[in-house]
Amino acid sequence: MTLVIAGERSGAGKTTVTIALLAYLIRRGLNVQSFKVGPDYIDPMFHAFVTGRPCRNLDPVLTSESYVKKCFSRHIQDVDCALVEGVMGLFDGVSQKKEEGRRKKEEGRGNKEEEQNYSISFASTAHVAYLLNLPVLFVIDCSRLSGSVAAIAHGFRSFNPNLNFAGLVLNRVASDRHLELLTDALKPLNLPILGVLRRDEAVTIPDRHLGLILWLRSPTVFVLLTQILISRVWC
């Protein structure tokens, strides 16, 4: 299994979901390699704490597109699963670049509408997902949403049809009634809801203006990991 964990913005819950999935897979006895889009070093510390192996950064700005491909290919050779945590919002990068066209065009199939080009931000999570041909697990912070969740999901999925959306994770869901409103709104999109994280301050990683608090300085992370390991986070 290989997945990119993306979100609609910073703070949506990408790291929490990534840690939850890593812990779940490790608990099942699988060998898992984690990756992080960009040069960030704090999130990889969380990953390594859970997996027991170094997280690898995928940064086409400081390296190159070819290096990103090579790095990913090299470090998934001896593992069962690979998870790539994205950066910021799905389409947030440093500049715009033009894709060569839909994969359907590359495969010699599809109509003209399907063969059009789409812009993508260089070094964004979307760029790396497209570069590595990986499906996207999309995390949405639902703490202040109900029906509007469908507009967000539809907008991100349709913005660049080249990306393969595997499904959604609904984060910070307040109650069963809240979940019902969200799922009812999302039904017409036929996007699988693959995970739900309930609102719980005990499983929130504190952050600061420069990113997440270092795990060595944050006892909250130990509460988070404990909750994950007893399956309170992932459902």
List each model region and its residues.
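Internal gly/pro-rich beta-alpha loop/helix module
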Residues: 146-235
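Conserved beta-strand segments of the P-loop GTPase G domain that flank and frequently precede/overlap
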Residues: 138-141, 169-171
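ATP-dependent carboxylate-amine ligase catalytic core
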Residues: 2-97, 114-131, 140-163, 176-180
